[in-house]
Every structure is written in structure tokens, then in C-alpha cells.
């Protein structure tokens, strides 16, 4: 179970979807947008890896979920890229959940970043937008304990048949309030002010 990684650092990159295309999910235009952004994410990982190689460091690009043995969501959360949302995807304060990831494994001595909270957990607890929009009702209203960790959970036994039947979906990321252009950073600031008042 697992494999060994010799590189000590991981760089996470994210490229944002065009909202006008992704909001059409599950239509083919949204699927094409996802593929365009996977391509952009892969190109960014390869460009960064090539630069690191040029600088004398080992670097291995990981260009998407089907081209890598690394699960990027846990790495992205650990790197502070975002938090897990109710819909099972990362929510980044700037991009919402409307983006695609790539990564680069490297031995370059880069500074480490840490997980960051921008209020997603509290927000998702009170929000039902993705849950109500999900045609197969795969998004659970409450967290579930999975492998000893209580977290947001998507029932993939419900999600995947719908996803496969429509050759993709993405409704949950398209309707997420964080994904609307210009909303995420303002929402994160508002939630931060609210947390500071409570503390």
C-alpha cells in the first residue's frame, strides 16, 4: 500500500476554471472546460519542473489524477492551498472549488507552508447549496468518520453512476458560493472578522 517518494517537497499548483463554462455543468461545455484546465495545470507543472531541473534540483511533475499515483487533495490541504468542502473538493479562498490541481515533487529546499483555515468548515456546516443541487443526492449533510477522521463525505456509490452516465458532472463545484467570481476572498475576510469577534 503506497510507494516511496525520494523528494522531500511538493509544490501544488491550481488553475482556475472559466466560470462561464463551468457553471454549465454537467453539460459537455463544462467537461471541455475541465479538460482545458487539466491541460493548463499539467503544463504549469512541467514548466516548473523544467525550471527546477535547470536550477540543478530533482523535480517530477504530477500532471493530474489519472497521471499520478499521488492523491493531490490531501497534499494540497497540507500545503495550505485550501480546505475540504462539503462537496468533497478543496475550497481555495480565491478560486473557490472551481480549479484543477497539479503538483511537482522536488528535492529543492523550499520553505514549508502549513494548512490554513479560512472558514470553510463553519460555512459548509450552515450551507446546503451543493447538497441540494446534487442530482443523485451524494453529498451528505453532516460529516462522517472515515478511516478514523471526521470529515465531509461524498457517497461515491451515488455520485459515480451519475457522473459516468453524463460523462462528467461538476454541478457541486459550479454552484458552490465560493466558486463565484469575486466572492471567495470577500467571504474569507468576512468569516475571519466573525471568528475574531467570537474569540
Regions picked out by a protein language model, each given a short descriptive name:
Residues 1-171, 175-197:
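Catalytic cores of enzyme domains
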Amino acid at each position: 500500500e503506497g510507494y516511496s517518494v525520494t523528494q522531500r517537497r511538493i509544490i501544488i499548483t491550481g488553475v482556475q476554471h472559466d466560470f462561464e463554462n463551468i457553471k454549465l455543468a454537467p453539460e459537455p461545455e463544462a467537461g471541455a472546460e475541465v479538460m482545458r484546465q487539466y491541460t493548463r495545470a499539467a503544463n504549469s507543472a512541467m514548466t516548473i519542473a523544467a525550471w527546477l531541473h535547470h536550477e540543478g534540483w530533482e523535480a517530477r511533475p504530477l500532471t493530474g489524477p489519472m497521471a499520478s499515483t499521488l492523491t493531490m487533495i490531501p497534499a494540497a490541504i497540507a500545503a495550505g492551498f485550501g480546505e475540504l468542502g462539503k462537496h468533497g473538493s478543496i475550497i481555495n479562498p480565491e478560486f473557490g472549488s472551481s480549479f484543477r490541481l497539479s503538483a511537482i515533487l522536488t528535492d529543492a529546499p523550499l520553505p514549508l507552508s502549513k494548512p490554513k483555515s479560512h472558514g470553510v468548515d463553519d460555512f459548509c456546516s450552515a450551507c446546503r447549496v451543493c447538497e441540494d443541487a446534487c442530482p443523485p443526492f451524494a453529498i451528505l449533510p453532516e460529516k462522517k468518520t472515515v478511516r478514523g477522521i471526521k470529515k465531509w463525505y461524498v457517497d461515491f456509490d451515488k455520485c459515480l453512476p451519475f457522473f459516468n452516465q453524463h460523462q462528467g458532472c461538476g454541478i457541486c463545484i459550479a454552484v458552490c458560493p465560493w466558486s463565484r467570481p469575486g466572492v471567495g476572498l470577500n467571504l474569507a475576510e468576512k468569516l475571519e472578522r466573525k471568528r475574531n469577534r467570537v474569540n
